[in-house]
Amino acid sequence: MEFKIIAEYFDRLEKISSRLQLTSLLADLFKKTDKNVIDKVVYIIQGKLWPDFLGMPELGIGEKFLIRALSIATSVSDDEIEKMYKSVGDLGQVAFDIKQKQQSASILAFLGAQKASKPLTVEKVYDDLAKVATSTGEGSRDIKIRLLAGLLKDASPLEAKYLVRFVDGRLRVGIGDATILDALAITFGGGQNFRPIVERAYNLRADLGNIAKILANGGIEQLKNIKPQPGIPIRPMLAERLSDPAEMLSKVGNIALVDYKYDGERGQIHKAGDKIFIFSRRLENITNQYPDVAEYISKYVKGNEFIVEGEIIPVDPETGEMRPFQELMHRKRKSDIHEAIKEYPVNVFLFDLMYYEGEDYTVKPLSERRKKLESIVEDNDYVHIATHIITDNVEKLKEFFYQAISEGAEGVMVKSLAPDAIYQAGSRGWLWIKFKRDYQSEMADTVDLVMVGAFHGKGRKGGKYSSFLMAAYNPDKDVFETVCKVASGFTDAELDDLQKKIAELKRDTPHPRVVSTMVPDVWLTPALVAEIIGAEITISPLHTCCKDQYAEGGLSIRFPRFIRWRPDKSPEDATTNREILEMYKSQLKKIEEKPSDQSV
């Protein structure tokens, strides 16, 4: 398959903002895609070479590196390319302009008589970029530059534009996984009504390229039979949120299994024979950070093949008490993991089982999953079943909540024991409800928002970006809707570190998936997720979250404050617009229920 087909579609996709039109055009591209390379095409659309969970190297090509390769490919000096880049602000557009100019000149000089270069294929582009990513050791820099320059030399102007953008991590076509799923269902499944089948398959095996290839070659029937596979992560089940214990019990059917909600790193742990894989909430392979956890699971959880889920918690080695979540960050920074294990020991608290010895447990109710999980974990000091109770009593639920808080947990998770309480991979629903500590605010809980823009500071913070436009995720439209502008809660060190990240993410125009009426000093590609608390949720004409619900404007957080970064969450894992709406309605309900003051 020729790479120019992808480049031409990317050029058309970039000019469209309507999700329906994006989906239709993407489905058209998939119809023209060779079934043998559909997986590679999907990865390229996602802006990657392979799924994150493989732990394979990323391209990691800096702008200087790209400029050098483009210079070699076009015989234009590095200085001239840098000058053009400063003027245009898009290295992909610079590549297009240079190649276009050279192409026009060669046509005039040779009147079309020169021999055309062999067309670039998707296979060639993918394989060479894979070599660029994986090349290491002495001489690897020269190999990378040579490979990249070779591709750019053979590329047409349009191909060069999107090659450079892909390598630079700035594809700009505005397509998320949800839109890809829609297009796959239309192209190979027979229509949008088959989308739930495609999505469930993706939720059970979070490798969209692999799912696309199975669907393209085997059809919708083959996807129906997909089960979890150890080594490929399952997209995690997510919880709704409430602050009224009575309402929680009512939502889950009046009786619940209530777990501690631990303040740790959510880990999905797979065993396949003698291999252990640990995946983060974002489905990244974090096995190397937790070799001790891999050893504990191998030793104390019975079975040859299974997938379990739990929280990895830092603990005090002397008392066994839970330590703050932030201590886990030291494991990521330490070069000597064995030293980190001694300094920051962890325990694992398991709360679910999704697969065991060839059997798909995601389709079984929680009561059956938990019973099996308890039967396979041996008594030990490192791997535990999450502390829990089963109750139908509101007062007992409250008591257990305060017990959890006193022992260092964030709160509790209230889980349905109904016969249909399956593991809803990749979905947020009322089968699980989180009940977290009240932050002494009208907002009953924190929210996780995506940074989509930045504003210059004033006074002491002049010269820095010091306030930030934050957005919630709208899963129905696959877009990010603004909720607030946050400036407080950041330390000076956090702001300094943030300047570097902004430099990598900034863009001149809003990202195609960002819906905003507010215009920041610089737009950002949605990537960073932060935990935010505020005084209350109000309606504001400045913001777009749930703007279709209220004539006066969208929902906004008053007096927002930064709590911490959530590196474990992807932008699509952020708090949804529906959750913000539910929090707002719950807040109104509380206000209405408060007795009014009466004069005597």
From Swiss-Prot:
<keyword id="KW-0547">Nucleotide-binding</keyword>
<keyword id="KW-0460">Magnesium</keyword>
<protein>
    <recommendedName>
        <fullName>DNA ligase</fullName>
        <ecNumber>6.5.1.1</ecNumber>
    </recommendedName>
</protein>
<dbReference type="GO" id="GO:0003910">
    <property type="term" value="F:DNA ligase (ATP) activity"/>
</dbReference>
<dbReference type="InterPro" id="IPR012340">
    <property type="entry name" value="NA-bd_OB-fold"/>
</dbReference>
<dbReference type="InterPro" id="IPR012309">
    <property type="entry name" value="DNA_ligase_ATP-dep_C"/>
</dbReference>
<dbReference type="GO" id="GO:0006273">
    <property type="term" value="P:lagging strand elongation"/>
</dbReference>
<comment type="similarity">
    <text>Belongs to the ATP-dependent DNA ligase family.</text>
</comment>
<feature type="binding site">
    <location>
        <position position="281"/>
    </location>
    <ligand>
        <name>ATP</name>
    </ligand>
</feature>
<feature type="binding site">
    <location>
        <position position="351"/>
    </location>
    <ligand>
        <name>ATP</name>
    </ligand>
</feature>
<dbReference type="InterPro" id="IPR022865">
    <property type="entry name" value="DNA_ligae_ATP-dep_bac/arc"/>
</dbReference>
<keyword id="KW-0233">DNA recombination</keyword>
<dbReference type="GO" id="GO:0006310">
    <property type="term" value="P:DNA recombination"/>
</dbReference>
<dbReference type="Pfam" id="PF04679">
    <property type="entry name" value="DNA_ligase_A_C"/>
</dbReference>
<dbReference type="InterPro" id="IPR050191">
    <property type="entry name" value="ATP-dep_DNA_ligase"/>
</dbReference>
<dbReference type="GO" id="GO:0005524">
    <property type="term" value="F:ATP binding"/>
</dbReference>
<dbReference type="GO" id="GO:0006281">
    <property type="term" value="P:DNA repair"/>
</dbReference>
<keyword id="KW-0234">DNA repair</keyword>
<dbReference type="GO" id="GO:0046872">
    <property type="term" value="F:metal ion binding"/>
</dbReference>
<feature type="binding site">
    <location>
        <position position="259"/>
    </location>
    <ligand>
        <name>ATP</name>
    </ligand>
</feature>
<keyword id="KW-0227">DNA damage</keyword>
<keyword id="KW-0132">Cell division</keyword>
<dbReference type="GO" id="GO:0051301">
    <property type="term" value="P:cell division"/>
</dbReference>
<dbReference type="InterPro" id="IPR012310">
    <property type="entry name" value="DNA_ligase_ATP-dep_cent"/>
</dbReference>
<dbReference type="InterPro" id="IPR036599">
    <property type="entry name" value="DNA_ligase_N_sf"/>
</dbReference>
<keyword id="KW-0479">Metal-binding</keyword>
<feature type="binding site">
    <location>
        <position position="428"/>
    </location>
    <ligand>
        <name>ATP</name>
    </ligand>
</feature>
<dbReference type="Pfam" id="PF04675">
    <property type="entry name" value="DNA_ligase_A_N"/>
</dbReference>
<comment type="function">
    <text>DNA ligase that seals nicks in double-stranded DNA during DNA replication, DNA recombination and DNA repair.</text>
</comment>
<dbReference type="InterPro" id="IPR012308">
    <property type="entry name" value="DNA_ligase_ATP-dep_N"/>
</dbReference>
<dbReference type="InterPro" id="IPR016059">
    <property type="entry name" value="DNA_ligase_ATP-dep_CS"/>
</dbReference>
<dbReference type="Pfam" id="PF01068">
    <property type="entry name" value="DNA_ligase_A_M"/>
</dbReference>
<dbReference type="InterPro" id="IPR000977">
    <property type="entry name" value="DNA_ligase_ATP-dep"/>
</dbReference>
<keyword id="KW-0235">DNA replication</keyword>
<keyword id="KW-0067">ATP-binding</keyword>
<feature type="active site" description="N6-AMP-lysine intermediate">
    <location>
        <position position="261"/>
    </location>
</feature>
<feature type="binding site">
    <location>
        <position position="434"/>
    </location>
    <ligand>
        <name>ATP</name>
    </ligand>
</feature>
<keyword id="KW-0436">Ligase</keyword>
<feature type="binding site">
    <location>
        <position position="266"/>
    </location>
    <ligand>
        <name>ATP</name>
    </ligand>
</feature>
<dbReference type="GO" id="GO:0071897">
    <property type="term" value="P:DNA biosynthetic process"/>
</dbReference>
<dbReference type="GO" id="GO:0003677">
    <property type="term" value="F:DNA binding"/>
</dbReference>
<keyword id="KW-0131">Cell cycle</keyword>
